[in-house]
């Protein structure tokens, strides 16, 4: 059943990539990307509330997948709107390097938190981190740079 949840995150990510990517082309990628981050943060609250109930875990997987897929699809467009296309590869490289560092540090940190304080503490940490990140994203000024 756990493997099915992982697969569901991946399938929902496709929906997020295609759906939010297309919507971003119509309404603008920046605020929609910020919303996708908020959706990911809310997924951890759903996971925390699941208390082992599989149906709620399915909801968590779908919400996380859609939010994550939207973030992946909208990031390059948001960078282009905010910074223009000159140097876009460098900016995206820095952005994805930051994500890679999180991917490197996150799992051992989560493991240490779970080992010392329990599974729910690990989920709570993820919720707090994602929530703070969402707030920070919403406080950033949204300036548009002329295309070059």
What is each of the regions a protein language model found here?
Residues 1, 7-13, 17-20, 24-81, ...:
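C-terminal transmembrane helical hairpin of 12-TM major facilitator-type secondary transporters
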Residues 23-24, 109-118:
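Interfacial helix-cap and linker-helix signal at transmembrane-aqueous boundaries
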């Amino acid at each position: 059943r756990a493997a099915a949840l992982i697969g569901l995150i991946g399938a929902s990510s496709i929906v997020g990539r295609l759906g939010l990517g297309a919507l971003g082309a119509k309404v603008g990628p920046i605020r929609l990307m910020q919303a996708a981050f908020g959706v990911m943060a809310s997924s951890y609250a759903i996971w925390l509330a699941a208390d082992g109930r599989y149906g709620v875990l399915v909801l968590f997987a779908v919400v996380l997948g859609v939010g994550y897929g939207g973030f992946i699809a909208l990031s390059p467009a948001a960078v282009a709107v905010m910074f223009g296309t000159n140097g876009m590869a460098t900016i995206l490289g820095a952005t994805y390097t930051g994500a890679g560092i999180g991917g490197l540090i996150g799992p051992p940190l989560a493991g240490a938190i779970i080992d010392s304080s329990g599974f729910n503490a690990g989920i709570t940490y993820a919720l707090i981190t994602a929530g703070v990140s969402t707030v920070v994203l919403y406080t950033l000024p949204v300036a548009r740079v002329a295309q070059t």
